[in-house]
Amino acid sequence: MISVNDFRTGLTISVDNALWQVLDFQHVKPGKGAAFVRSKLRNLRTGSVQEKTFRAGEKVEKAHIENRRMQYLYASGEAHVFMDNGTYEQIELGEKQIERELKFLKENMEVAIMTYQGEVLGVELPNTVELQVTETEPGIKGDTASNVTKPATLETGLVVQVPIFINEGEMLIINTGEGKYVSRA
């Protein structure tokens, strides 16, 4: 059992006989009444996203998920193919199962496949990934105001805000948890 006060992004829990992954959470302390935790959860079996509210201090069951190291090979229509590096076994995951992770996946990338009692649930990404900028506006010389950003489209289709000095073709390090620019690669 784990307290909802200990929620963190990516945590897997079992609530109402379903497996959920915490996508987002917020501790709320209203001026009047008891504190609570508002969370956004994704059902690992169906891919549906739900918002649930828990009382502060409420206990939920932590799901023990096993991670298998695999390599992302390619997309085949709606299916995405992964290969176990040790056994060369290939598995296919549907687009709905890995919808959020698709923005960060590149061919031949090493990832962890989450399984629960032999059932494949989804993909766990590394904390950061290197992606190439495919489209962005050119930076304007002399624009030195602090924290000036512009949108940049990356090779996977992900759009992130980057500093004004970033140009097309550059490799960037992106935080997969927040989907934000970290630095140049």
From Swiss-Prot:
Q: Which residues cross the membrane?
A: none
Which pathway, metabolic or otherwise, does it act in?
Protein biosynthesis; polypeptide chain elongation
Q: Which cysteines are joined by disulfide bonds?
A: none
Instruction: State whether keyword Ribosomal protein applies.
Output: no
- Report the record's Gene Ontology biological process terms: peptide biosynthetic process
- Keyword line: Cytoplasm, Elongation factor, Protein biosynthesis
Where does this one sit in the cell? Cytoplasm
Q: Name one GO molecular function term.
A: translation elongation factor activity
Gene Ontology CC terms, in alphabetical order: cytoplasm
Function, as annotated, reads: Involved in peptide bond synthesis. Stimulates efficient translation and peptide-bond synthesis on native or reconstituted 70S ribosomes in vitro. Probably functions indirectly by altering the affinity of the ribosome for aminoacyl-tRNA, thus increasing their reactivity as acceptors for peptidyl transferase.
Q: Into which family does the record put it? A: Belongs to the elongation factor P family.
* HAMAP family recorded: EF_P
Spell out the protein name for this chain: Elongation factor P
Gene name of this polypeptide: efp
